[in-house]
């Protein structure tokens, strides 16, 4: 396999594929976009360069970014010609197993045998798509999030045959592009959408039960626990709040809502083992000596203060009209 990725083809010049291509080109990788035909890809390139200039003018990209993208991002060849010369091909077409399998088959047919093939699916497992790919050891999900130019996290999902060197090469690519890859198991929805959809389902239940309006639910989420999530994940947040506190909270919730909000087994095991979080130095995410406790608290306070400053600077987000 290609140990270091230097050339990339993104198949699909739409919103997601275009954003991925733009992000990688900005990291000084040579990127080519292809689409249903050459003219569509050329129009996509024109749009991406215009968008990059707008981002630069708005201060969202550093000065000179558009020129960097222009120097590294190309279009004008067929899929067959483009993928034949690429170290890494990222499929970013319509979220349909049938469509993706058809496109992946074409990519696989014309790509070098050592080229790595990724799919940007957000919900479809690798094992559903892998039959379309020759040499399945080089295939994996590389799931960027929307908007790709600004969201740093990328989910990586290996199939049964995917080799570690393939994952390592993609992680290196992502690091060079200022992205952070997280490996997750091959299941529908992976982690991002499983959590995101679960939150929306519970939020909708709150509205359906008349507990709060959708607007007030959004306010609660963005101004409380959602405020923290740019800096800490759910396990780190639980460590800071106290795992024993969480366990007691789950007991109250399970009395009201039943098994779906019963305490997680892993949480109960941690509490039973005397791991209560940062406060007693033994948490879900690790152990905390006095110095580390102080560092966590200082980072948290600085992060939340800066987030507050940013929100005040930006003001409220625009809302749809009712």
Name these PLM-found stretches.
Residues 116-186, 190-194:
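Rossmann-fold dinucleotide-binding core
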Residues 1-54, 58, 110:
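NAD(P)+-binding Rossmann beta1-loop-alpha1 motif at the extreme N-terminus of oxidoreductases
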Residues 39-40, 56-117, 124:
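Rossmann-like NAD(P)-binding element
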Residues 32, 76, 90, 140-142, ...:
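Hydrophobic/aromatic beta-strand patches that form the interior of the parallel beta-sheet core
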Residues 37, 62, 163, 212-216:
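Helix N-cap / loop-to-helix initiation motif
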Residues 40-50, 165-176, 216-219, 223:
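A non-catalytic, amphipathic alpha-helix used as a structural packing/dimerization or gating element
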Residues 2, 176-186, 209, 214-322:
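NAD(P)-dependent Rossmann-like dehydrogenase/reductase catalytic/cofactor-binding core
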